[in-house]
Each structure stands twice: as C-alpha cells, then as structure tokens.
C-alpha cells in the first residue's frame, strides 16, 4: 500500500474503494500475524490519542471552515477538499476535553477513510505527531473496559522513548475506536 505526504501530513492511497478494502483486509491479517498495530498519533489538549491508520485517508492543514447553521456543537462546519464537501468534527468538543494544548497550536484535520462513513468526514485535532507501529504487547485492551463511558476506546498504548538525557520516558496513548464514535453520531451529519 502506498503512502504519501500531503500538506505536511499523511495520506493513504484510496483510488479504488474495492481494492483499498482488499488491501486493508490483507494488511489487517498481516498485522494480526505479526502482532503489530499501525496508528496515527495526535494530540488534543495535552493528551495523546491515536486512531487506526487504515481508518484514515490523509492529514491536512486546517483551511477556512464554513459553518453549518443549526448543526450540533461538535460539528465545526464543512470544507471543500479538492471538490468533495467534507464535514469537520471537532474531537475536543465531541469528547468534552476542555483543556487547550499547552504547545504551539498547529491544528490539523485527519480526513477519515470512506470505509468509516458514507460521508466524507474530517476530525479536527490540535496536532498530528506521527504514524507509529506498536507491538500488541504495548497495548492494554482491558484497563479501560470496566469504566463507564469508555466504549470508544480500543486500548491504552504504553509509549516509551528516550529523552535528551538518554533517560527512558513513558507516556500513555489512548487508542480511539473512531468507527464506533462516528457511527454513533452519523445521523447528525
């Protein structure tokens, strides 16, 4: 599967939906065998989140967004993305995250794959960090399951990296079930 950079972001080649579905299915099978997961990592407020790479199409810088009258508060508006009207959802509002990002604001839109919804949808986030592979051993899929209201979380990823001094630093990345989240609000779109 080819990936390319678009507007300082990531794009997954989706020329033919049927071929893309076969590629996604094939890759998912390979990932399960290898025991790895590919995610797009992003930040909202000061928290790290991730969505499955194959639920995304591309990442773009935030263009001017046209408001939609009487839309739910989490719908920021719509954009014209190369001739296709794309609805923009503010994930901060949808997930009730009040805290603003403490870093420089470089908001991005993650455009979701056509397999996620019948409509073209983009999710507004504070910044996109990377596309990362994680071993399934790095993912805790049980920690969140007992908590009420966490049905949109696929797991919690333990991310380790070395800081400038060479010390091991770890953080948690919340792996979102973006398909379930969009499915729940699709009637409002």
Each predicted region: which residue ranges?
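An acidic, low-aromatic, low-complexity terminal/linker signal
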Residues: 1-189
């Amino acid at each position: 599967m080819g990936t390319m950079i678009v507007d300082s972001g990531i794009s997954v080649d989706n020329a033919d939906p049927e071929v893309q579905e076969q590629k996604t299915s094939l890759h998912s099978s390979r990932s399960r065998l290898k025991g790895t997961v590919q995610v797009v990592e992003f930040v909202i407020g000061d928290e790290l989140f991730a969505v499955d790479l194959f639920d995304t199409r591309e990442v773009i810088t935030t263009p001017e967004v046209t408001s939609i009258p009487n839309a739910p508060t989490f719908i920021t508006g719509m954009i014209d993305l190369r001739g296709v009207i794309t609805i923009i959802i503010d994930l901060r509002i949808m997930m009730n995250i009040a805290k603003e990002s403490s870093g420089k604001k470089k908001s991005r839109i993650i455009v979701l794959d056509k397999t996620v919804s019948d409509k073209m949808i983009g999710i507004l986030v504070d910044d996109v960090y990377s596309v990362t592979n994680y071993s399934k051993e790095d993912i805790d899929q049980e920690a969140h399951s007992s908590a009420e209201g966490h049905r949109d979380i696929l797991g919690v990823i333990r991310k380790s990296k070395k800081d400038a001094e060479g010390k091991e630093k770890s953080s948690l990345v919340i792996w979102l079930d973006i398909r379930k989240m969009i499915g729940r609000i699709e009637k409002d779109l």
